[in-house]
Every structure is written in structure tokens, then in C-alpha cells.
Amino acid sequence: MSANRNLSLVEILEKILNYTSIDDRVRAKLRPGLSRQEIQAKVCHFNFPFSLPQEVEELYQWHDGFDLDDYDCQLFHYHTFLTLDEALETWKDFQDDGFIQKDLLPLFTFEGEWYCIQVEKTKQESGQIWFVYHDDGIVYDSLKAMLFSILECYEVGAYQPILKNGRVYTEVDREKVAEVKLKYNRVRQQTLNQYEKHFSGDFYDHP
């Protein structure tokens, strides 16, 4: 069954947790959400020169990432959720190293992979999501579109989480995942058009 398009960002996140929290640590390790004042104080502390999109504020008002001592927790398929301090500190380190462009703020990570949101100087409701690894590229239209796509992957069985030896593993139907992500993110069609030869005979399911 497809997910409900009218869900709020927080409702989407809670529904994703219904799948990934088969690992008891997931809910236990989520940090309490931040107030708007706390969010703004952290932004100022790190001299972050951009305005956080509304959907990022909603994300961190929901929960402030996972506790720092446990990176095995998955908010969704194999990626963990950075605290706002971690996100801003990582952004600062990236700028010092010249690793990525300045207007990308990391939110989710796994072993050198990063999902980053594009930010602007002025307040925006949303921002496009970039995948940063060996190559950088836009992969989701917005944070909400990304999370909604992930939720629907769980809802239709394209992602099937399994708890094994105390860890969550996910069985993936790559064709279904590619179909769902393309349905809700127009930017993925642009990527497909650009790299048609690369994806020939394959499924654009990741990232």
C-alpha cells in the first residue's frame, strides 16, 4: 500500500521508525528535540552563514539525531541521523578541507557517504538533497520528498528490514525502490537522462 501524501514531515519520520525500530536501540538512542531558540543558538555558535530550511528545523524539533556513542543505529536503510552539533561541525570541517561546496549541510551519514541539504542565505521551506561520496549530485527534490520516498519503500515492501544478531539488515527490491524514488523526485529523471548509458540495464535505486 502506498504512503499517504498528506502526511507531515514528523508523521513520515514516525512511520519510518515503525519499521526501523525493530532494533530497540533506535528509539532509545534518539535525542530529545530542540526548540527553535536552541536551533538558532547552535547555528550562531558555529557561525553558519545560511538559514536552515523550515523542514530542517522540523527535523531537529522532532529529534536531535542519535546519541554520539552509537553509530550502528539506522534512522532508515543503513544511514544514521546526525545531531545538529555534528551536522554543523561536519559542515565546518568540510569547509576547512574544501571537501564540498559551501551551501551543503550534512544530515545523514554512513561510512563516508553523506546526504546533505542545500541551503540559502534567505529562509526557505525546503532544499534539494545531495548525495556526497566519490561524486556529488542532487538525488531528491527535498528532505520531505526523500523521507516520503523512503517510507513508501517500506510500505510497499521494497525495503524489508530484518533483525539479525541484534542488528537491522534490509532486503532491497532494487526495481521497486527505483520506481518509488523516481515517482516522487523529478530531479532523478534529470539524472537518468544525463547518465542514461551508465544506468542502462540497471536500476537507479541508490542513492
For each predicted feature, which ranges?
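A surface-exposed partner-binding patch
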Residues: 1-115, 186-207
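Long, low-complexity, intrinsically disordered segments enriched in glycines and aromatic residues
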Residues: 63-182
